[in-house]
Amino acid sequence: MESLSLTWITAIAVVLYLVQRYVRSYWRLKDIPGPVLAKLTDLQRVWWVKTGRAHEFHRDMHAMYGPIVRFGPNMVSVSDPRVIPTIYPSRPGFPKGDFYRTQKPYTRNKGAMPAVFNTQDEDLHKQLRSPIASLYSMTNVVRLEPLVDETLTVLSKQLDERFVGTNDKPFDLGDWLQYFAFDSMGTLTFSRRYGFLEQGRDMHGILQEIWNFMTRVAVMGQIPWFDEIWNKNSFITLFKRPTGFGVLKVVDNFISQRVSSRENDEKADEKDMLSQFLNIQASNPHSIMPWAPRAWTFSNVMAGSDSTANVMRTMMYNLLVDRDTLKSLRAELLEAESSNGLSRSLPSWDGVRSLPYLDACVLEALRLHPPFCLPFERVVPEGGITVCETYLPAGTVVGISPYLANRDKQTFGDDADKWRPSRWLDLSREDRVKLENSILTFGAGRRTCLGKNIAILEIKKLFPMLLLNYEIEIVNPENYQTTNAWFFRQWGLHAVIRKLPAPERDDTIEQKASIPPALNIPPSSSTVDVRIIDSGTLLDLRPDLFWTPDLPGLLKVTAPTYCFLISNGSRHVLFDLAVRQDWENLPPSIVAMIKSQTVIQEPRNISDVLDSDESSLGIRSKDIEAIIWSHAHFDHIGDPSTFPPSTELVVGPGIRDTHWPGFPTNPDAINLNTDIQGRNVREISFEKTQKGATKIGSFDAMDYFGDGSFYLLDAAGHSVGHIGALARVTTSPDSFVFMGGDSCHHAGVLRPTKYLPCPLDSGDTSLPCKSDSVFTLSPALPTDYTAALRTVENIKELDACEDVFVVLAHDATLKGKVDFYPSKINDWKAKEYGKKTKWLFYKDIENAIEGQK
């Protein structure tokens, strides 16, 4: 009997406690209007979210009750963007609510992991955000622009191959915008794409995993206490996958691979964000938690791509259904192309950053359809706050939904629900700032989204590329749907795509050249003699491995292989050795690669070329002081063993560690032990502290002979240790020959440029762009594509100088047009070789196209 009484007493106590709690909760916010059920329970919020239309319910509630509405027993929603600075201040004190606790990924072994965007602890947030904030500044993000260019190139190629010329077969353009956003962030974070674009599908189920994560946390965020029971519970996770497990698995795999490569002294790309994350933690082990790189990387994968894709889909959909705005944007882009040389294939940030209508379209897309579309919840601090003339006591959860703030009619006008980019034009600075500050898409105050600049960069580069190269038409726009599960997802953006013709050249207008940067080559009275040796070896190249886009008739290019004899008085060096005569004795993996990808015709050892020379020159293989490899690929290394042991081998940074031991000691090596056997190998360093280190144009350089006559240049990217060379061949006036190695394989990658626009009489008038290079470097082969693109840009600066003659190792247009070994090329400028050969590649392309026709 006593036991029964105790049970009743306990039950009554629990009921009284719950009643007291409900009454207290109801009473403290009793003056705030809202639906009755919402004042008593959070189940009203749960149901709204479960429908996928919570934003519409929120809108209707505010239309009924005003700018401040009670959405739950302790949750208040505000719709007035004028109070954004109050709820989301720059100072600490307004922590995020428990809604964000549900967004921490969970594993049984490590528990819930905080990240920059989901942590509620403001001190921890500062610890996580401060070390990496500078990485997301626009200054740093722009340095990563070549990585976005790499992904743009792949997207364009996939669109061309899969959808252009398919008789207007519709495809899901929304999916492909998402693939681009994810592969761009993958490249920025890991230096490699996830593979969405190449495969045309959701790789590793990442996209579905993120969507599943969002649908879970959207509901749990309304009743966060239940998340601890149902999702973040080590017992429950024995029977179901933890929240965010799939994304964490991808993150952990990338991090473990990178850490392993570092431990094995393998070269990793130190420029991507993962390497920077690891470096930051390693340099501050006492103040930064060991798990921080994992948290930072998780944020990039989870929040850094889907949200960008969301804005891309919004902007594309509205442009396609409102063709007038599409025409206006395309007109602005065409004007930028015509007036400022904006590239069609890879629009530069400098070329697009300040285009007014493009900027207006991006802002309107950010405003109209924010990627996250539930209230951004904050906890009112001690002392309470007053918003919309209503007092909110401490502990109240308050938030503004970006969907409501961004469509506020008092701020954005009566047409705030409509797409109208022109609302952003012709505003005073004060009005423009007011509107921008009223958009809550990226958050506000001290918790503003770190990835904002990355998203803007990607969007402003993507749309010019698409609209200048393609005509896109939406199919069945009524099928375009949206679902709000915290993440405001769109579905059904189907379209057809056609390639736009290249712009016609105006033969009456000569493009004005921009002034290239100064090269600042150190003065010297010393020169060298340069002789181009045509080894006689021909290689059949697949263009898609070396440049994009593909052109009709250029399915195969037969290219020569050049090397160079450099003479400084009685000192002679060779820059490259072409292909060795007995190339089938190379390592088996290289022989197999050669047989599958190319055809070698008439290979010849350079030592034999020198020793069989019947001219009066008299320089033999025994006279060669050093062999300099531009890099260690088979078509440049030749056979050093045919030179005496006294001949030194000079290589670029990192070659020794990555290429030796050679074959057969290392079965996987691409070089032979005999390449270095019995001879000294000297590895060049471009460190500023090294003797002879200098700067030429944008290149780090090393004065080889020490007299200013011959420089080796750090031309990184194509392969480990890739270098170029610059030789001074005359003085008073100075003139130079640049030897580019494999920095690129076709002059169309270098020309035209804004420094060197195409002259009117250069050849085929149907070829594109007088100030935009015909081709872009392909990402297929370079070991460091970012560095390779940067090297090409650096060479363009040299190429624009009338005193520099650029010679690429495989430039077929030079054959029969310039002097070859045993003659010198020192008088190239007097013979006007630069003017006569610079644009021959246009005729080369024209002939290929005509041959295809």
UniProtKB/Swiss-Prot annotation:
GO biological processes: mycophenolic acid biosynthetic process; terpenoid biosynthetic process
Lumenal side: 1-6
Catalytic activity field: 5-methylorsellinate + reduced [NADPH--hemoprotein reductase] + O2 = 4,6-dihydroxy-2-(hydroxymethyl)-3-methylbenzoate + oxidized [NADPH--hemoprotein reductase] + H2O + H(+); 4,6-dihydroxy-2-(hydroxymethyl)-3-methylbenzoate + H(+) = 5,7-dihydroxy-4-methylphthalide + H2O
Location(s) in or outside the cell: Endoplasmic reticulum membrane
Cellular component, GO annotation: endoplasmic reticulum; endoplasmic reticulum membrane
UniProt-listed InterPro entries: Cyt_P450, Cyt_P450_CS, Cyt_P450_E_grp-IV, Cyt_P450_sf, Cytochrome_P450_monoxygenase, Metallo-B-lactamas, RibonucZ/Hydroxyglut_hydro
Residues that span the membrane, as ranges: 7-29
Keywords associated with the record: Endoplasmic reticulum, Heme, Iron, Membrane, Metal-binding, Monooxygenase, Oxidoreductase, Transmembrane, Transmembrane helix
Gene3D superfamilies xref list: Cytochrome P450, Ribonuclease Z/Hydroxyacylglutathione hydrolase-like
Pathway of action: Secondary metabolite biosynthesis; terpenoid biosynthesis
Membrane disposition: Single-pass membrane protein
Cofactor(s) demanded: heme
Domain of life: Eukaryota
Enzyme Commission number(s): 1.-.-.-
Pfam entry (one): p450
UniProt GO MF annotations: heme binding; iron ion binding; monooxygenase activity; oxidoreductase activity, acting on paired donors, with incorporation or reduction of molecular oxygen; polyketide synthase activity
Segments in the Cytoplasmic topological domain: 30-853
Binding-site residues for heme, renumbered to this chain: C449
Family listed: Belongs to the cytochrome P450 family.
Main function: Cytochrome P450 monooxygenase; part of the gene cluster that mediates the biosynthesis of mycophenolic acid (MPA), the first isolated antibiotic natural product in the world obtained from a culture of Penicillium brevicompactum in 1893. MpaDE' is an endoplasmic reticulum-bound enzyme that catalyzes the conversion of 5-methylorsellinic acid (5MOA) into the phthalide compound 5,7-dihydroxy-4,6-dimethylphthalide (DHMP).
Protein's name according to its UniProt entry: Cytochrome P450 monooxygenase mpaDE'
Gene designation per UniProt: mpaDE'
